[in-house]
Amino acid sequence: MNVRRIAPLLNHRAKRDTTILNYQFSIFHSYREERQQMFLNIVKADGTAEQAVIREMKARAAGARGDIEQIVRGVMADVQQRGWDAVVEYAERFDGKAPYIVEPKVLDDAYNACDPKLIAALEKAAANIRDYHEQMLVKTWEWNRAKGETLGQTVRGLSRVGIYVPGGTAAYPSSVLMNAIPAKVAGVGELIMVTPPTENMSNEVLAAAKIAGVDTVIAIGGTQAIAALTYGAGFIPQVDKIVGPGNAFVAAAKKLAFGTVDIDMIAGPSEVLVIADHTANPTYVAADLLSQAEHDKLASAVLLTDSMAQAQAISCEMERQAKLLPRWDIIKESV
């Protein structure tokens, strides 16, 4: 690499952030000396090369969808036919244990085990979400016109809603708040949260369920959880609507459930596109890309830049940060 070509980049930012510039220069120097393969697949857009990348990304997602939907369709049909026996069978196979209700005391203990600063942040977020959605609330109204005419609308919350909350190595307490609190504001009668059982269930997620006012938490995940909520099985009742994100299997199950129950949306793998010129901070850009890449092996994290030096700097910074994250194996697959 011709280091002289990046000298203007270093010089014009020197007064603003010498530390970042020195760090960037060390990355460029390391790359020049070691000539290591870039963490990111860097493609020069020429009208053809980028189209090949886009086709590859689409094909990867489409191929996975086809295989997954076939598996999910079989599980959904089996649960519909055999009910609770099928749910338990799949839960023991994929979750490692039969479904169970998480007792209120477990939620209380999880709440008390969390850092008080985290609890304060969750409660503040809950209050903000509640206040915002109260302003959006569609209300019942009636208009009495002349000659006995009465027009209007009646708005009622659904009787029962199921909330899917992802498990695994990542904790998503925000997902609990953003799904449960608007439902409470809307007047939903009963909230049932399902989340995969783990050896140590996330205290943050369980605390968020307590703060949001979730009525019942059930330890079950994956397609079998969506199937149980869709058709009702054992102590898991049928719901009117299923909301919340999940992996590709959960998304496919929600797609098949739609029509029997309502759903919020079919959420595909996470995608992010970051546009950054030479002035962008590689540390921040890398963090933005990784925040989506770590969600799923089929996630897509794409960077657009007009600076090859910047592309290489961000690639190196992504690799440095990624190796510090617990979902390193997933990130390697997604990028």
Feature roles, as predicted:
Residues 213-300:
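Conserved NAD(P)+-binding/catalytic subdomain of aldehyde/semialdehyde dehydrogenases
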Residues 298-335:
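NAD(P)-dependent aldehyde/semialdehyde dehydrogenase
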Residues 143-207:
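Conserved small-residue-rich beta-alpha loop and adjacent elements
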Residues 74-78, 272-277, 303, 335:
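Short, well-ordered beta-strand elements within core beta-sheets of diverse protein domains
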Residues 37-159:
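N-terminal Rossmann-like NAD(P)+-binding subdomain of aldehyde/semialdehyde dehydrogenases
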Residues 1-11, 15, 20-32, 37:
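Short, basic, low-complexity termini and linkers enriched in Ser/Thr/Gly/Pro
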